[in-house]
Amino acid sequence: GQNIYPDRQMLLFAQDVLARVPGGTIVFDVKCSQRLAPAIRAAGGVALMYKTGHSLIKAKMRELDAPLGGEMSGHIFFKERWFGFDDGSYAGARLLEILSRAPNAAAVLEALPDSFSTPELNVACAEGEPHRLVAELQALADFAAPAQVNTIDGLRVDWPDGFGLIRASNTTPVLVLRFEGQTAAALARIEAELLALLRR
């Protein structure tokens, strides 16, 4: 078997919710897979990447009247047919509902687009250092096209074949890193580029 991480589960939840709420905005955090936004748009929704933090995602959902939001950490918020707060048991029930409609539940999960990715990596720092380091990295970031830089929450750099993220944790003095590539080689290249920037 394999772990189906929450950002991949969000692909299923978004498709399901958007079938009933066409054009809805789906909010997700900067740690989520690069494959999520295109899947949301393909299902007729609006994809909005936002800052990590369950209270921040929930507030943005309220602001935009979004029917669904989620984080890579596993906080999933359903406003469509529910109350808009994160509820693990309810998210599990919604996943079972989706799988129960398919003749082969395993095939539904196997069909989800996959990538090569790291889990969330934490680098311990002195108190106050993570935010200072991230501000320096944002100032140093100078990536050539086709790279796209996003500084809404740390430094996320997207390439056509993957992304890298360095951000400061909201709760502890650590840098949070995550890397994803569509191939193992892309993952290694992206990780090397971001770590080289971090070592400057």
Regions found by a protein language model. Give the residues of each.
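Short Gly/Thr/Asp-enriched flexible loops that form oxyanion-binding sites at enzyme active sites
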Residues: G1-M10, L36-A37
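A conserved helix-loop-strand patch within extracytoplasmic ligand-binding domains
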Residues: L12-R20
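A general alpha-helical scaffold signature found inside nucleotide-binding enzyme cores
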Residues: Q9-L12, T52
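Phosphate-binding and adjacent anionic-ligand microenvironments
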Residues: A19-R178, T183-R200
